[in-house]
């Protein structure tokens, strides 16, 4: 299993929509390609690289990919693992709205707590 570690650089003012943070989206991609995946805060569009420090390596498939998420502002991030079908997502902090929403497979581990509308 290969692991990609992402660490939030700063706490978002608004909710940061992170539906790209899922093993299915990271699988088979380089760190540069992962950093280029989209996210948004309010009406503003960003890339994951704008908000997260990214290290490690993704697996060839979602099933071979683990994502570790760190940072003090994870409670302001939504849609972690949304639509994931395989792999593992580990949130070392609070997981908020729509974390693993529409999840079809894989594993979620939250090391602190869920907040609103998770799962």
Residue ranges, per PLM feature:
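Charge-rich, low-hydrophobicity low-complexity segments
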Residues: 1-119
């Amino acid at each position: 299993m290969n692991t990609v570690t992402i660490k939030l650089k700063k706490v978002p003012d608004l909710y940061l929509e992170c539906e790209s943070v899922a093993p299915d989206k990271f699988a088979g991609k380089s760190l540069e390609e992962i950093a280029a995946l989209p996210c948004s805060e309010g009406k503003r569009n960003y890339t994951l690289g704008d908000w997260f420090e990214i290290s490690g390596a993704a697996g060839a498939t979602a099933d071979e990919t683990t994502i570790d998420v760190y940072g003090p502002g994870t409670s302001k991030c939504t849609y972690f693992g949304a639509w994931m079908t395989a792999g593992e997502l580990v949130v070392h902090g609070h997981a908020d709205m729509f974390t693993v929403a529409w999840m079809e497979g894989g594993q979620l581990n939250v090391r602190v707590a869920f907040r609103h509308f998770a799962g």
